[in-house]
Swiss-Prot record:
GO terms for molecular function: glutamate-1-semialdehyde 2,1-aminomutase activity; pyridoxal phosphate binding; transaminase activity. The modification N6-(pyridoxal phosphate)lysine is found at K267. It comes from the Bacteria. InterPro entries: 4pyrrol_synth_GluAld_NH2Trfase, Aminotrans_3, Aminotrans_3_PPA_site, PyrdxlP-dep_Trfase, PyrdxlP-dep_Trfase_major, PyrdxlP-dep_Trfase_small. Its cofactor is pyridoxal 5'-phosphate. This is Glutamate-1-semialdehyde 2,1-aminomutase. Its EC number is 5.4.3.8. Belongs to the class-III pyridoxal-phosphate-dependent aminotransferase family. HemL subfamily. Keywords: Cytoplasm, Isomerase, Porphyrin biosynthesis, Pyridoxal phosphate. It comes from Xanthomonas axonopodis pv. citri (strain 306). It catalyses: (S)-4-amino-5-oxopentanoate = 5-aminolevulinate. Its main location: cytoplasm. Pathway: Porphyrin-containing compound metabolism; protoporphyrin-IX biosynthesis; 5-aminolevulinate from L-glutamyl-tRNA(Glu): step 2/2.
Length: 429
């Protein structure tokens, strides 16, 4: 493939943008090489500035569940912008979005629109702290909740030790309010609550880990956290920015049958536009300003164009059988990838929940962050580049989930698997 124009743009971008990008994973630091620059997208495909076409399994990191540039979403945006881009005042589309979310996700009796998933998680944690009068939160290894200071914390040398910041600029005093657990560790969660349960405002978790690749919860694990939170008076926050409306119409909470107190959303509810939201029990949400004393605001929150895009996308995912077909397509892809790897003599396993999947270069079923980080990253990186040369774009990191869309039909998946057979054979040589 020719990437001359992408190469020139990346060289220019590095003089103007930190690392040449506006979000770190896009720079290909994890896999090596240089990123391609996208010119347009349609259905399951991306097209770069050098006119190369890629089958896309990143999907803008999750929002494009119906494929890129879907006509219904595009038309909704075109119609909305005729009336203006931003009002800074209430609009009917905000109400329609709130009605849709509260209908599809019953645990959310009220919602507040924001501009990103990070805003949603930060606001949900502030609400939890304000509502409980407590300051500590618990998060999990491999779960990403945005770039807020409270979330950029890793576990210390022992499970119950104070948090340690993972980025310069995060005050140690703030990170000490965040405890980190291993995902799927039943005993660890119980022990930590026995130690500090009376101080915990909230547990925040991706119900399916999406930032250590894709790791589902073990049977009963989310319910175990629900029980611990209820017992100790802490709130349970599900970060469904990735899983919301993707793994099931009602999100991971519907898929696993566990009800959180608060939920955060993003990605799909914007249809590709910058949007986030958080919602939950009415008694909690009524404490958010101006109804209550817990402050949160945003100039562009509830933007009419973003609401129009999100409403159109949510209409699409409500079509009968949408999620069943999406899950079946994802299973076809994952099974085919495992078969292709096995034929080449390469150890690969996959995880899948609905239209979300993970590819791990290991013989083991991956159920924890530690297992994910123990996989063969070097071989993944070689496979990534071999697939890219075959015109298939996977997430440019071994620690990011993949996303299926309804535009990935059987022919597209067959083409992907043909490319994978070539790529695995190349890696095996």
């Amino acid at each position: 493939m020719n990437h001359s124009r992408s190469h020139a743009l990346f060289a220019q971008a590095q003089t103007l943008l930190p690392g040449g990008v506006n979000s770190p994973v896009r720079a290909f630091k994890s896999v090596g090489g240089e990123p391609f620059f996208v010119a347009r997208a349609d259905g399951p495909y991306l097209f770069d500035v050098d006119d190369n076409r890629y089958i896309d399994y990143v999907g803008s990191w999750g929002p494009m569940i119906a494929g890129h540039n879907h006509p219904a979403v595009r038309e909704a945006v075109e119609q909305s912008i005729r009336n203006g881009l931003s009002f800074g005042a209430p609009c009917a589309a905000e109400v329609a979005m709130a009605q849709t979310i509260t209908r599809l996700v019953p645990s959310c009796e009220m919602v507040r629109m924001v501009n990103s998933g990070t805003e949603a998680t930060l606001s949900a944690v502030r609400l939890a702290r304000g509502a409980t009068g407590r300051n500590r939160i618990i998060k999990f290894e491999g779960c990403y909740h945005g770039h807020g200071d409270s979330f950029l914390v890793k576990a210390g040398s022992g499970m119950l030790t104070l948090g340690v910041p993972t980025s310069p600029g995060v005050p140690a005093g703030l990170s000490e309010l965040t405890a980190t657990l291993s995902f799927n560790d039943f005993e660890g969660a119980t022990a930590l609550f026995d130690e500090i349960g009376a101080e915990v405002a909230a547990v925040i978790i991706e119900p399916v880990v999406g930032n250590a690749n894709c790791i589902p919860p073990q049977a009963g694990y989310l319910q175990h956290l629900r029980t611990l939170c209820t017992r100790h008076g802490a709130l349970l926050i599900f970060d469904e920015v990735m899983t919301g409306f993707r793994v099931a119409l009602g999100g991971a909470q519907a898929h696993y049958g566990v009800t959180p107190d608060l939920t955060t959303f993003g990605k799909i509810i914007g249809g590709g536009m910058p949007v986030g939201a958080y919602g939950g029990r009415r008694d909690l949400m009524e404490q958010v300003a101006p109804a209550g004393p817990i402050y949160q605001a945003g100039t562009l929150s509830g933007n009419p164009v973003a609401m129009a895009a999100g409403l159109a996308m949510l209409e699409l995912v409500q079509e009968p059988g949408f999620h069943t077909r999406l899950s079946e397509a994802t299973s076809m892809l994952c099974e085919g990838l495992e078969d292709a790897a096995r034929a080449a003599g390469i150890a690969v396993t996959t995880n899948q929940v609905g239209g979300m999947f993970g590819l791990f270069f290991t013989d083991d079923i991956v159920e924890s962050y530690a297992q994910a980080t123990a996989c063969d990253i070097t071989t993944f990186n070689r496979f990534f580049h071999a697939m890219l040369q075959q015109g298939v774009y996977l997430a440019p990191s071994a620690y990011e989930a993949g996303f299926m869309s309804s535009a990935h039909d059987e022919a597209v998946i067959d083409a992907t698997l043909a490319a994978a057979r070539e790529a695995f054979a190349e890696v095996a040589r």
